[in-house]
Amino acid sequence: MNGAGEINASRHRKENELKTCQILGAPVQSGASQPGCLMGPDAFRTAGLTQVLTELGWAVTDLGDATPTVEPELSHPNSAVKNLDALVGWTRSLSQKALEMARSCDLPVFLGGDHSMSAGTVSGVAQRTAELGKEQFVLWLDAHTDLHTLHTTASGNLHGTPVAYYTGQSGFEGLPPLAAPVNPRNVSMMGIRSVDPEERRRVAEIGVQVADMRVLDEQGVVRPLEAFLDRVSKVSGRLHVSLDVDFLDPAIAPAVGTTVPGGATFREAHLIMEMLHDSGLVTSLDLAELNPFLDERGRTARLITDLASSLFGRRVFDRVTTAF
């Protein structure tokens, strides 16, 4: 074969290679106030997530479920803090797994599990981003900012702390040191509608970008999301999306222990996922806080699976592009 033929053959192989996705269950429930999140990964599997992504043209590998490292029992001066040793074990394990997955596939997906899982998943993918010499960005779709530290949490439920941890805030003694903290100004939150005073102060202090539900009511989801995606694109950054079930209105997604009225609608959520797909910027994904014990015949698991499929390329409606 001549040189031109070899180049064309190589290009043809690359064009026909499937994008790779690895799925990892993170059956974490030690950070939540109610039991049940440990069943989340299997509920997503039962809802057909792997099959849907395969049908969309992805080469999907399910790695099973992660397990936490075994840690000594830990106490903290804040007596409200619960299950600190479990948080350390899960963070250490998931961070290493996330790093390995980000090195070996195009788009890792982490199935929760309560949102404390993101202390590990985000810190792991951020380490890979640093290896590549790029900037890590995070889109946090949630009713809560999750910006407490071990010292400020009043409930002691550690699913309220991951953003403060992975952005390198102080107050996490005993947790694994961060190899690559995420710049808090690279974190964009949408759907926020329940914030404690200490978290409100920290948002202003560190520069996290917040589009709460009032902003979404007044501007819609398009303007704030487009502005954020433009920032990511301009620096060729890598984008981690973390979707908490309570981002959605509990009327359509009841399977979460932290319901807050007034969440995102089905249409708003699908539009966000379609915009993310169109951007081509997403490099990793969390699906967090699914509690099947609180679900209605798998309704929420199916909805989140449907949203994930939109992010991976399935559309609610096929759109015709018109040239003007």
Swiss-Prot record:
Residues the entry annotates as binding Mn(2+) 1: H115, D142, D146, D244
EC number: 3.5.3.1
Catalysed conversion reaction: L-arginine + H2O = urea + L-ornithine
GO biological process: arginine catabolic process to ornithine; urea cycle
Subunit structure: Homohexamer.
Family per similarity comment: Belongs to the arginase family.
Protein name: Arginase
GN (gene name): arcA
